[in-house]
């Protein structure tokens, strides 16, 4: 498994763009494309996981583990007390659990578990972060960098601090890889913190639906109008692939052939 690294403590817009490109290239199925948009592999791919190593200020690091077929964050590790400390969401079970444990922290090295006692779904993370919506949790390179420092190597931290970090990391890594619109929000607001707007939240919640609609399009027209949201929360009706294509970085895997590659 290749590790993609991003130094948030020493970042530029170009470095973030390169990180996004590397992540999409590692994740995508090289043989699948739909209307020019790369697609993630199905669950049978040989390489099932991806590692993303994030570095914050003063060389603190956290490594995220992603499921390759949907970019879902399964857990993370950090160096703690000269050991590899791994943190796995409580909805990861069975063989996947041991895969995450052994990939984040190979058994040849001393390791210690610090479980995440909740799942990785947005409503859960929002509740643990003490917010009613994740639009209350600001995103930004500086925030990502300082959040890494609040967890990496620390003897203790609250669930609130952890959930906030996870909300920031999931959106700035996985969601930004899925959606160029979200990547561009990070780039536009690069030197300041920002709240994710209504379009960001809506895209995040409709990635599967958007992927299926694009995949099932005929001659560039969606099977039926897709009702999404603009940045200001107003209704955005999408009729054609071209209208949403600039916002999409990766499609979720959809079975069957796509009319246009």
UniProtKB/Swiss-Prot annotation:
InterPro entries: Ribosome-inact_prot_sf, Ribosome_inactivat_1/2, Ribosome_inactivat_prot, Ribosome_inactivat_prot_CS, Ribosome_inactivat_prot_sub1, Ribosome_inactivat_prot_sub2. Disulfide bonds join 34-258, 84-105. The keyword Disulfide bond applies. It comes from the Eukaryota. The active site is at residue 175. It catalyses: Endohydrolysis of the N-glycosidic bond at one specific adenosine on the 28S rRNA. GO terms for molecular function: rRNA N-glycosylase activity; toxin activity. Keywords: Antiviral defense, Disulfide bond, Hydrolase, Plant defense, Protein synthesis inhibitor, Toxin. It holds the Pfam family RIP. One of its GO terms (biological process) is defense response to virus. Its EC number is 3.2.2.22. It is an enzyme of class 3 (hydrolase). The keyword Hydrolase applies. Belongs to the ribosome-inactivating protein family. Type 1 RIP subfamily. Inhibits viral infection of plants, and protein synthesis in vitro. This is Antiviral protein S. It comes from Phytolacca americana.
């Amino acid at each position: 498994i290749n590790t993609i690294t991003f130094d948030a403590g020493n970042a530029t817009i170009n470095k973030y763009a390169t990180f996004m490109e590397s992540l999409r290239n590692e994740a995508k199925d090289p043989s699948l494309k739909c209307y020019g948009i790369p697609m993630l592999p199905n669950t049978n791919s040989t390489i099932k996981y991806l590692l993303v190593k994030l570095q914050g200020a003063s060389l603190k690091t956290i490594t995220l583990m992603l499921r390759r077929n949907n970019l879902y964050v399964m857990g993370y590790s950090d160096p703690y007390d000269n050991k590899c400390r791994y943190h796995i969401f409580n909805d990861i079970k069975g063989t996947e659990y041991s895969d995450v444990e052994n990939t984040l922290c190979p058994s040849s090295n001393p390791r210690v578990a610090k479980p995440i006692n909740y799942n990785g779904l947005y409503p859960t993370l929002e509740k643990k972060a003490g917010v009613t919506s994740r639009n209350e949790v600001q995103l930004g390179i500086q925030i990502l960098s300082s959040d890494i420092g609040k967890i990496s190597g620390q003897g203790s931290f609250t669930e609130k601090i952890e959930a906030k970090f996870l909300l920031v990391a999931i959106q700035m890594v996985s969601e930004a890889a899925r959606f160029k619109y979200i990547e561009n929000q990070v780039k536009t607001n690069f030197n300041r913190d920002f709240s994710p707007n209504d379009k960001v939240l809506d895209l995040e919640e409709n990635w599967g639906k958007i992927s299926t609609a694009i995949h099932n399009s005929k001659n560039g027209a969606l099977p039926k109008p897709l009702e999404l949201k603009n940045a200001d929360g107003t209704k955005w009706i999408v009729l054609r692939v071209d209208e949403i294509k600039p916002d999409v970085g990766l499609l979720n895997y959809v079975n069957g052939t796509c009319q246009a590659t």
